[in-house]
A protein has these predicted regions:
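Alpha/beta enzyme core
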Residues: 1-210
């Protein structure tokens, strides 16, 4: 990705559960930066985020609807009640105090997202919470229309790439069927597809193997 997008800000995910200690997290964080990442997305514990941040690794944290914790809340907006909003905001301040540089704010009410953005030093990256965050993000399969499942309310499809991929797949299948039919009917290969050997050279070959 870095090779084709040299000017893009890349926050590379440290998949939840792939490391089992703060030391491993720090090591993996440095590996991500060495690969060309600008920041490390991390939804692990505050302690781990703090350990990575202390080593100078820019961390992108996550509040609101956090997919790997969705079994706690289901896939729904988070922060619509005063108590939930307070918990989300407290999470933001805890992450800020731990040294995170950015925070994804996902599927929270626009009022809460606006308040968070105005009251944190972190860069806020919003999805599903209006236009009040510092930056916006969407998943590429939503943008390009390759998502075969449910499209969330906040998503916007710009291109129906799935339909184009289905057309391409139909053409692939058609091409393979044409090849099989052509081969079975004797239409392929034709003489123009063959490599010819000089007759004298072929005679010499036959002499050599006698």
């Amino acid at each position: 990705v870095r090779e084709v997008a040299s000017g893009a800000f890349l926050s590379v995910g440290l998949k939840h559960g792939t490391v089992s200690s703060k030391q491993e997290a720090v090591k993996k964080g440095f590996e991500i930066l060495e690969m060309g990442g600008d920041a490390v997305y991390c939804s692990h514990s505050i302690d781990w985020i703090e350990a990575m941040a202390k080593e100078g690794i820019p961390i992108t944290a996550h509040v609101g609807l956090v997919p790997n914790r969705a079994t706690w809340t289901n896939y729904r907006a988070v922060g619509k009640t005063a108590d939930e909003a307070l918990q989300v905001y407290q999470n933001v301040k805890d992450l800020e105090n731990a040294g995170a540089a950015c925070v994804e704010v996902e599927v929270v009410p626009v009022e809460l997202a606006d308040f968070i953005t105005k009251n944190t030093k972190m860069i806020t990256m919003g999805m599903g919470c209006g236009d009040v965050c510092d930056t916006q993000y969407l998943f590429c399969n939503d943008i390009l229309g390759t998502n075969t499942g449910h499209y969330p309310r906040h998503a916007k499809k710009y291109i129906d790439l799935k339909a184009e991929e289905e057309k391409l797949q139909a053409l692939r299948e058609k091409g393979f069927r044409m090849f099989v039919e052509d081969m079975n009917s004797g239409g392929y290969p034709e003489s123009k597809h063959e490599i010819k050997m000089d007759s004298i050279e072929f005679e010499k070959f036959q002499e050599k193997i006698k």
